Amino acid sequence: RGVDLSPYAWVDDMQAMAERSDVDVVLELVGGSDGPALTLARAALDAGKGFVTANKAMIAHHGLALAEQAALRNAPLKFEAAVAGGIPVVKGLREGAAANRIERIYGILNGTCNYILSEMEQTGADFGDMLRAAQEKGFAEADPTFDVEGVDAAHKLAILAAIGFGARV
């Protein structure tokens, strides 16, 4: 890789790592709504560590409980990249919700579907052709199931609804 990783401690026990006194913030890159990612989140927050993730599935399914746990331990829980990674929509929504009554949320929740549907409408091409084109251009994953079946958009919508309206979706 060209990067010397020898100075860094490697662990295979997430619980122990989250409890280490020399760890202030835990960054989760595991993925999945349950299992190791959730175990790590709970362990880090229980230990009062800051926790950062872009894991939209975990935040959609367990975000409210994790937020309560974080508040009890006065530990930061950050997940801005879980929704519209390049746009600070979570921060904006939190700040807007604190000062205003939010009535609606509009937006494109899934870029893959937006590309496919827009191209289908403009060119008349069929879904399969546009999905392959999206994959070739890097807009769609090799396994686009979560995108084209709406799971990705549902996760994002659940997060936005929880922040904007206090709703469990």
Q: Model-predicted segments: where are they?
A:
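N-terminal glycine-/serine-/threonine-rich beta1-alpha1-beta2 phosphate-ribose binding loop
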Residues: 1-46
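Short coil/turn connectors at secondary-structure junctions
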Residues: 5-6, 21-24, 47-48, 72-75, ...
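Electropositive phosphate-/nucleotide-binding environments in soluble metabolic enzymes
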Residues: 11, 20, 35-38, 60, ...
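General beta-strand structural signal in soluble alpha/beta enzymes
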Residues: 11-12, 19, 27-28, 52-54, ...
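Rossmann-fold NAD(P)-binding glycine/threonine-rich loop
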Residues: 32-47, 54-95
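A glycine- and small-aliphatic-rich helix-loop capping segment at beta-alpha/alpha-beta transitions
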Residues: 49, 71-73, 94-100, 121-126
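Active-site-lining helix/loop region of Rossmann-like oxidoreductase modules
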Residues: 99-169
